[in-house]
Amino acid sequence: MTEKQFRSGFVSIIGRPNVGKSTLLNRILGDKIVITSDKPQTTRNRIQGIHNLPGCQMVFIDTPGIHRAKSKLNKYMVDVALSSIKEVDVILFLVEADAKPANQEGMILELLANADAPVLLVINKIDLVAKEALLERIAAYAALYPFREIVPVSALSGDGVERLVEVVHGFIPAGPPYFPDDILTDLPERFIVAEMIREKIFRLTHDEVPYSVAVVVESFKERADGLVSIAAAINVERESQKGIVIGKKGEMLKRIGMQARREIEELLDTKVFLELFVRVSKEWSENTRMLKEFGYE
């Protein structure tokens, strides 16, 4: 196969918070590179996942959910999502099968009105609705925007995902691969480790605590015996949040550490010594300097 025949391109996955964008990307790749939880706004950064097929490389971009931003952190997240619409080859607009089009979807469709790339509607969570309801949802969205294709899927079960990849493949232009064919993401290991720790905090804590946390890997060392030693700081905004993350007699921090360490060991394929500590960084989500320091820039 000649280089001209090879196809490669970038595919942006956008939608409001908590519609399953990260779950879909993990399902497409057949591996977990993006953290997930049942809470909205789990994804904060642009995440690139690389899916290789014979003669084709698709770089899928997972983005934060598009919402009305309040804090500087939220504004950063929305800016990341909106910037991903530009200079991509395909846009996947992900919605839920069990929810009617609402104001947030309307706002996103307005943003897509001038998109240069073809926009495909992906209706997720089809396992939650009957066929009649799904057909109604397809008709409702088709009346709102001239989507090039409409593909129903269940990111959780994988139903329809293979067909989605086939449909996307048809829109990928000719070009050489952007990345080697043996990597799933261009993200550094430190970033993925920090995200795995943050995922456990999202899953184990509640209310405002998950949204007030930033994790920074401060030390990442491979020892002579093959064990990897990692030290990470969990930044919160208030003393009360610090107490919640640590928990009674340190039990919550132990749970976070144990669950994160197991996943990190699977990622790195080696034993890991994980040290976590919690510090108060007051109002970091509104502080430009700290946002950059914590990787939100």
UniProtKB/Swiss-Prot annotation:
Keywords: Cell inner membrane, Cell membrane, Cytoplasm, GTP-binding, Membrane, Nucleotide-binding, Ribosome biogenesis, RNA-binding, rRNA-binding. One of its GO terms (molecular function) is small ribosomal subunit rRNA binding. It is a peripheral membrane protein. Residues 124-127 are annotated as: G4. Residues 15-22 are annotated as: G1. Residues 153-155 are annotated as: G5. Residues 62-65 are annotated as: G3. Residues 205-282 form the KH type-2 domain. GO terms for cellular component: cytosol; plasma membrane. GO terms for biological process: ribosomal small subunit assembly. It is found in: Cytoplasm; Cell inner membrane. An essential GTPase that binds both GDP and GTP, with rapid nucleotide exchange. Plays a role in 16S rRNA processing and 30S ribosomal subunit biogenesis and possibly also in cell cycle regulation and energy metabolism. Belongs to the TRAFAC class TrmE-Era-EngA-EngB-Septin-like GTPase superfamily. Era GTPase family. Monomer. This is GTPase Era. It comes from Geotalea uraniireducens (strain Rf4).
